[in-house]
A protein has these predicted regions:
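Long, amphipathic alpha-helical surface segments
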Residues: 1-5, 9-46, 59-62, 66-92, ...
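N-terminal hydrophobic or amphipathic segments with adjacent small-residue motifs
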Residues: 50-52, 105, 150
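Short, surface-exposed loop and linker segments with low hydrophobicity and enrichment for Pro/Ser/Thr
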Residues: 46-48, 99
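Alpha-helical scaffolds flanking conserved acidic
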Residues: 33-37, 96-105
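Early exported N-terminus immediately downstream of N-terminal targeting peptides
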Residues: 51-59
Length: 178
């Protein structure tokens, strides 16, 4: 009887740890998503009618979408559109797991097709996550290196790239809190 109680107790403890780890992972993902939104807003800023077909924080108006080309979106509408676009991008890259966020952010700026054909995706498909230099090299505008875009890439990478150390630290934090 005592052995059964210990086994049940151990099972509950393991389940509680797994549940805590899932909650920690979800909280980390939510917080990284908020960081991604913050970075995009910082560098895209709000687009005005003269920037057509870009609206809000860089959403490209697609055929069939109803936007008034003479009106600037409200902050809340632009924010909702940015979040929706970023989530769509991340879903496209979900096969890359923890790298779906950073790929989605890059696609938000340079386009989905460009990211899909990139050397970054090629390296990740080969299992090579040493992509910092390549990621930052996506800093050109009209063929020339652009300092502001380079700064953006560095900030995106430094704040959004999830390292193995980061994952280990998150797991240790969960264990310490139990």
């Amino acid at each position: 009887m005592m052995i059964a109680a210990v086994a049940v107790s151990t099972g509950f403890a393991a389940e509680a740890v797994a549940s805590a780890e899932r909650r920690q992972e979800e909280a980390r993902a939510d917080s990284l998503f908020e960081v991604a939104v913050e970075i995009i807003k910082k560098y895209e800023t709000m687009h005005h009618p003269r920037h057509w077909p870009l609206v809000g924080y860089g959403h490209k108006v697609l055929s069939g979408e109803k936007f008034d080309r003479k009106t600037t979106l409200t902050e809340s509408r632009a924010d909702a559109l940015l979040r929706s676009d970023l989530r769509k991008n991340m879903r496209v890259f979900r096969q890359f797991g923890r790298d779906s966020m950073i790929l989605g952010v890059l696609a938000y700026n340079i386009g989905m097709g460009n990211v899909m054909r990139s050397s970054i995706v090629k390296k990740l498909r080969e299992g090579d996550r040493d992509i910092r230099d390549i990621y930052i090299s996506y800093n050109r505008y009209r063929g020339k290196t652009h300092k502001q875009i380079k700064r953006r890439r560095i900030e995106e990478f430094d704040r959004l790239f999830i390292t193995d150390t980061h994952i280990a630290n998150t797991a240790n934090t969960v264990k310490e809190n139990d």
